[in-house]
């Protein structure tokens, strides 16, 4: 796991997290994304799925899901990109306060363009 956390402006710290799961010959990208979706929903009450679509990350097929939820008086937005490459599942998670999320899209996009699997 690799985590980057920005400063908290009082509404929640923006963050970018990359995880890696050894899957072997296991789940497809759709199944892996479904597993990540289930984990998000298990962790938060009142979560709203805003988007669920196929896309690419650094030239690799991916599923992108965007969520919104409130916790402790803060409304947060989270975007998750899921990929399965050579039996390994990768999840990139970008989170920020809902009001700040759109302003960080360029930062998140730069990180995604730089994503490499070696």
Language model regions located:
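Surface-exposed amphipathic alpha-helical segments
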Residues: 92-118
């Amino acid at each position: 796991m690799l985590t980057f956390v920005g400063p908290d402006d009082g509404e929640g710290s923006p963050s970018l997290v990359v995880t890696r799961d050894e899957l072997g010959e296991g789940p497809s990208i759709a199944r892996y994304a479904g597993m990540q979706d289930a984990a998000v929903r298990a962790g938060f009450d009142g979560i709203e799925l805003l988007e669920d679509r196929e896309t690419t990350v650094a030239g690799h097929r991916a599923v992108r899901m965007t969520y919104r939820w409130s916790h402790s008086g803060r409304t947060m937005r989270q975007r998750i990109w899921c990929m399965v490459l050579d039996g390994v599942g990768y999840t990139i998670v970008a989170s920020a306060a809902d009001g700040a999320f759109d302003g960080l899209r360029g930062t998140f996009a730069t990180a995604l363009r730089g994503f490499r699997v070696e």
